[in-house]
Swiss-Prot record:
Function, in words: Catalyzes the conversion of lactate to pyruvate.
Cellular compartment(s): Cytoplasm
Source organism per UniProt: Streptococcus equi subsp. zooepidemicus (strain MGCS10565)
Main localization category: cytoplasm
Annotated catalytic residues: H179 (proton acceptor)
Keyword Magnesium included in the entry's annotation: no
Regulation: Allosterically activated by fructose 1,6-bisphosphate (FBP).
GO cellular component: a single term: cytoplasm
Upper classification of the organism: Bacteria, Bacillati, Bacillota, Bacilli, Lactobacillales
EC number from the UniProt entry: 1.1.1.27
Residues carrying Phosphotyrosine: Y224
Protein name in the entry: L-lactate dehydrogenase
Gene: ldh
Complexes and interactors: Homotetramer.
Family according to the record: Belongs to the LDH/MDH superfamily. LDH family.
Length: 327
């Protein structure tokens, strides 16, 4: 793939609620010139491709079609949303084994097509499935990316913005760690238009310390709330994926919170994918952005990574997954 290439091709694997919402976001935001959609329900992908194509007169030209794995061979980006959905009362980590099997089958077929681009993983549990995509593909770690805490960070910024009465785009704050129950807020570096969050709150008295705790809990548990109300989350993550896609296809070198391979960026955190900011462009992860964490935040990062690593190690101790690993 070249950063100057004008015809950008995306293959989406998984045409469920997240996948179809992502496809819609690509069309409405004029991202990419070609979109192929793969799903086991071929007729559904044909219907979605036809339906989406009817929006092109209002947006920009794009080739949209129901694809096969062979179509991945010259894609710039393959986006993986295929997987069993998270059910009410089920954590993202409960999904591990069934979605690892799906991931192994999908990634094996994509690699067999001759695909040389970038993997973007969104299926849950995303940090573990990003790791397994890296293992099953044999690709360099920079070319396997997970959506990570991109949505969590967006929720965090929006919640803070609503609380203090500013535009969410003026709030700069990250959620790091697992995209899930062990994630944490990086309070030490949160700011509003360059003003440290604590300084802002001291001057404006918008919320007290307990209010911040409650705000974080609402962000962390947002998916459970939405799933209980409507069965699934898909709009927010779809737009987050579209943003990451644009950063890759346009070679933006944008800093986004993603699921990034760990090899000692943070003390005691290695051999796993986990959410942290990173520079991303046409060739994948350019480099991680290692925000200096305070002691409490570092402990949370380590605890989150240890939880993921334990699940990864247990999963890849099984022959069906260990035998398929290429990395």
């Amino acid at each position: 793939m070249t950063a100057t290439k004008q015809h950008k091709k995306v293959i989406l694997v998984g045409d469920g609620a997240v996948g179809s919402s992502y496809a819609f976001a690509l069309v409405t935001q004029n991202i990419a010139q070609e979109l192929g959609i793969i799903d086991i329900f071929k007729e559904k992908t044909q219907g979605d491709a036809e339906d989406l194509s009817h929006a092109l007169a209002f947006t920009s030209p794009k080739k949209i079609y129901a694809a096969d794995y062979a179509d991945c061979h010259d894609a710039d980006l393959v986006v993986l949303t295929a997987g069993a959905p998270q059910k009410p009362g089920e954590t993202r980590l409960d999904l591990v084994e069934k979605n690892l099997r799906i991931n192994k089958e999908v990634v094996t077929q994509i690699v067999a097509s001759g695909f040389k681009g970038i993997f973007l993983v969104a299926a849950n549990p995303v940090d573990i499935l990003t790791y397994s995509t890296w293992k099953f593909s044999g690709f360099p770690k920079e070319r396997v990316i997970g959506s990570g805490t991109s949505l969590d960070s967006a929720r965090f910024r929006q919640a803070l913005a609503a609380k203090i009465g500013v535009d969410a785009r003026s709030v700069h704050a990250y959620i790091m760690g697992e995209h899930g129950d062990s994630e944490f807020a990086v309070w030490s570096h949160a700011n509003v238009a360059g003003v440290g969050l604590y300084d802002w709150l001291q001057a404006n008295r918008d919320v007290d310390e307990q209010g911040l705790v409650d705000l974080f809990i609402s962000v962390r548990d947002a998916a459970y709330s939405i799933i209980n109300k409507k069965g699934a989350t898909f709009y927010g993550i779809a737009v987050a994926l579209a943003r990451i896609t644009k950063a890759i296809l346009d070679d933006e070198n944008a800093v986004l919170p993603l699921s990034v391979f760990q090899e000692g960026q943070y003390e005691g955190v290695e051999d796993c994918y986990i959410g942290q900011p990173a520079i991303v462009g046409a060739y994948g992860i350019v480099r991680p952005v290692n925000i200096p964490l305070n002691d409490a935040e570092l402990q949370k990062m380590q605890a989150s990574a240890n939880q993921l690593k334990a699940i990864i190690d247990e999963a890849f101790s099984k022959e069906e997954f260990a035998s398929a690993a290429k990395n």
